[in-house]
Amino acid sequence: MKGFYLLLVAVAAIGGGALWYQSQRNVAPPAPSAPLPVAAADAFHGFTLGSASAPVEVTEYSDFECPFCASFATVQMPVIREQLIATGKLRWRFRDFPLPSHQYSRYAAMAAQCAGEQGKFWQMHDQLFNNHQWAQTGKNPRSLFRDFARASGLDLDKYDACMDGQRYAARLDASIQEGDALGVRGTPSFFVKGRPYTGRGTSDDFKALVDSLTKTHK
């Protein structure tokens, strides 16, 4: 474990959070011992990629409107998927943390949740981040997100019903409250073994982290 902590310190010193999007939330963080909200403790704890038996798991708190989240998703994540997730070394867990300063981030999160209902979360995730121009226009993205849903192979009638009914509002609230309880204040934020990871968040950094943790537990 000593190697793990030394690596976190070293990476933090090198990176300084280059991919960190800080936006202060208006709520004070609860005491570390405060229990998570009841709604956050249900059976759903985020969408995952990778084997459940992977030796290392990373939890990402992300905002679909966040430009640094989009950069991470389109530049770093494809390498992480190929080199770490597909090879069974890493499991990735995605949690929503739409920031209140972003007008349509919660709507985007809802679109991804509704896609997840049809088993297409990661397809919608990629559509939202790969076509991130929507986040810079300031225009209501409702029709564009519906196009993303179509491109993701969704049943549009089911998608529309889910969006109109705000079916996963409570789930999003629970994810945000869980992030608040952990002290998340910006996106993307990463947690490894329940501890915040403060490195640059590059694919090389995560590879080094996985290698270190894997060696530690051999």
Regions found by a protein language model. Give the residues of each.
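Short clusters of hydrophobic/aromatic residues that line enzyme substrate/ligand-binding pockets
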Residues: T48-L49, W134, Y197
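A short linear-motif detector with a strong N-terminal bias
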Residues: L36-A40, C69-A73, A169-A170
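Short, well-ordered turn and helix-capping elements at secondary-structure junctions
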Residues: F44-H45, D96, H132, I176, ...
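A short beta-strand-turn-helix
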Residues: A39-V56, L84
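C-terminal cap of thioredoxin/glutaredoxin-like
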Residues: K2-V27, V56, Y61-D63, M77, ...
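Structural alpha/beta surface segment adjacent to cysteine/selenocysteine redox centers
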Residues: A54, S62-R150, D155, L182, ...
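Ser/Thr/Pro/Gly-rich low-complexity linker/stalk segments immediately outside membranes or between
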Residues: S23-V38
